[in-house]
């Protein structure tokens, strides 16, 4: 991040959603700012805090005061707009308004680490070389070096009917990767949807799609819906081969994850209805049967496994709500 550049010289803004994961946030901010300090382009950071109560907001304010050259802006959520999608949309709108010459929006989460500036430089070069690409993500790994998923193919009704575990066993979620290509020393390929951890987005594509659909996809599947809408407009998604990008929550689940299984089913149903058609309603009897089988299995398991009791309650909830689109 070049401190000599004023706001008019900022070309890239990193957007971070923060909610009650201070230890991860500290690591994410530290590695990001360290990488950006060596960048040849002007940059800034906008953090949306969704109501953290673990000291995250206080850490951010102290960091901003102690590091003014890092161009760190903080947005505190209002009570009625605290979802993940709201946070990204609000922060991106603020970034564009605050830095009018911004060309790139870098969606970066608290469980990300950027080890150096090279991945970002490659992503910018690739998007400049390939004008049909809306965004570029990276092959990512955990802190221990193990591979972590970076994207997936657009989901089918079959994969939804089978459930996440069985669909994964059948390889129905694997990215539909193209062959690897090389452009200006950058090894990359495409797939349907690239996750937002992290993701460099072309401003033009973001504005054309009007960002995330926060009303229908406040949390899960918002990135899939956005990628699908991009594809319908002719945009593509790229993955860049990299060894320098981390995606690892270190087993610290966000408070946003508390109702994940129900949210997943509700949003996946909406996603498939929007992009695959109204025939998704024909799956309801199949989904009801699946939830019934899951309920029976969890009921037996809950006798010896206390953790299964909460899962059982969620399955019972889905049994009741599947007929009303999980609402």
What are these model-derived regions, one by one?
Residues 187, 192-210, 215-243:
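A short, conserved alpha-helix in the catalytic core of glycosyltransferases
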């Amino acid at each position: 991040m070049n401190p000599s550049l004023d706001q008019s010289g900022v070309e890239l803004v990193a957007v971070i959603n923060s909610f009650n994961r201070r230890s991860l946030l500290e690591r994410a901010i530290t590695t990001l700012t360290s990488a950006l300090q060596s960048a040849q382009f002007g940059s800034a950071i906008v953090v949306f805090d969704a109501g953290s109560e673990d000291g995250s907001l206080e850490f951010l304010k102290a960091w901003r005061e102690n590091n003014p050259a890092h161009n760190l802006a903080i947005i505190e959520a209002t009570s009625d707009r605290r979802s993940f999608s709201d946070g990204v949309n609000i922060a991106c709108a603020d970034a564009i308004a605050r830095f009018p010459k911004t060309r790139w929006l870098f969606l970066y989460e608290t469980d990300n680490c950027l080890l150096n500036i090279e991945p970002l430089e490659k992503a910018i070069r690739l998007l400049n070389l390939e004008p049909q690409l809306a965004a570029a993500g990276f092959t990512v790994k955990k802190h221990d070096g193990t591979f972590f998923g970076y994207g997936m193919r657009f989901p089918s009704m079959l994969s939804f009917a089978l459930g996440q575990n069985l669909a994964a066993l059948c390889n129905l979620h694997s990215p539909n990767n193209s062959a690897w290509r090389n452009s200006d020393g950058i090894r990359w390929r495409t797939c349907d949807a690239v996750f937002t951890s992290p993701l460099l987005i072309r401003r033009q594509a973001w504005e054309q799609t009007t960002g995330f659909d926060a009303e229908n996809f406040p949390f899960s599947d918002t990135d899939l819906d956005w990628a699908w809408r991009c594809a319908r407009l002719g945009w593509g998604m790229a993955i860049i081969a990299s060894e320098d990008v981390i995606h690892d929550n270190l087993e610290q689940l966000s408070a946003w994850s508390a109702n994940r299984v129900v949210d997943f089913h509700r949003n996946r149903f909406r996603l498939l209805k929007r992009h695959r058609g109204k025939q998704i309603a024909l799956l309801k009897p199949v989904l009801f049967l699946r939830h019934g089988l899951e309920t029976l299995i969890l009921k037996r398991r809950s006798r010896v496994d206390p953790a299964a009791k909460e899962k059982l309650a969620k399955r019972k909830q889905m049994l009741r709500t599947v007929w009303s689109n999980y609402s």
